[in-house]
Amino acid sequence: MEKMMHRETERQRRQEMASLYASLRSLLPLHFIKGKRSTSDQVNEAVNYIKYLQRKIKELSVRRDDLMVLSRGSLLGSSNGDFKEDVEMISGKNHVVVRQCLVGVEIMLSSRCCGGQPRFSSVLQVLSEYGLCLLNSISSIVDDRLVYTIQAEVNDMALMIDLAELEKRLIRMK
């Protein structure tokens, strides 16, 4: 009688372990399984996959933090460290900052969401007139303000672009 109970318990344990291994196998991506493997190989691949995911999480966290620092710098528009002055400038009417960046020119345009912001197509037209080609554009809403961050490169390297003049032109736009 005791032997039969022991066999039944062992059979249930094996079935449960088989279902747990199947569940583990179903959670792993195909490139971590690679054909029919022993259970110890599957567990090792699961450990490798967990380590891989932990590395990716760390990399993405660092990337997120870097992007947040960049976006804060872009939003504030200056590196002089005068945070209060920058916030006051941005919280007023339309605000434009034009500066050089690695790829060419970066433009940060901020305006109230409720109206008065220049149309994006008008901004693109001005960039085209100055010989700039749009590379990247990000728009977001921050504290009831519409913020465009635009990166553009110079089409013709022979052209010298007056950043102050471009900034004034973008400020005058309605």
Curated annotation (Swiss-Prot):
GO CC, one annotated term: nucleus
Main localization category: nucleus
Signal peptide: none
Keyword Glycosyltransferase: no
Compartments where located: Nucleus
PROSITE patterns noted in UniProt: BHLH
Expression sites by tissue: Expressed constitutively in roots, leaves, stems, and flowers.
Family annotation (InterPro entries): bHLH_dom, HLH_DNA-bd_sf, MASH1/Ascl1a-like
All residue ranges annotated as the bHLH domain in the record: 1-53
Entry keyword set: DNA-binding, Nucleus, Transcription, Transcription regulation
GO biological process: regulation of DNA-templated transcription; regulation of transcription by RNA polymerase II
GO-annotated molecular function: DNA binding; DNA-binding transcription factor activity; protein dimerization activity
Assembly mode: Homodimer.
Protein name: Transcription factor bHLH36
UniProt lineage: Eukaryota, Viridiplantae, Streptophyta, Embryophyta, Tracheophyta
Protein encoded by which gene: BHLH36
